[in-house]
Amino acid sequence: SSSAASDVYKRQPIMLIAALCIKLYDHGPVFFKQKRLTIGGKEFYVYKFRSMIVDAEKDGVARLATKNDSRITPVGKVIRATRIDELPQLLNIFKGDMSVVGPRPERPEIAKEYEESIPEFAYRLKVKAGLTGYAQIYGKYNTTAYDKLKLDLMYIESYSILEDLKLILATFKIVFTKES
């Protein structure tokens, strides 16, 4: 969409600074891509600025990041705290893999684990994955997968353009205030 292209253009200085900081810190790759799921279980690569050490999962085991994860670099801590690490996902929105609002895209192997213990988890794939949503606005970093799922399902049940606009505004408020 043209608004996603416009957002990428407006954020170029921030993205350039983030890219330089990541590269200067450890000379590793600036971007990180990872297979995720969107509507209908379709796989796609999500793009982010790399916030962890190179080869953070070299053992091949998929692990969710924790609050004080030792794999997160000092630059990574800053770009995660400010949500700058998510900006490359504007490209995913532009490509049509994601929408601005919707459940966060999950990794296939982690989604499979969740579906085994929470069968309703698959319901999240009825809509396109998003950059922000109820779980990001009303949940906290340490919210359980089940609680995030309940928030995602609330979003799916109450979807509307007006609701999406409210969530986008709430996201900006969170990103640009200290309480987040």
PLM regions: where:
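Short, hydrophobic secondary-structure boundary micro-motifs
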Residues: 18, 32-33, 61, 101-103, ...
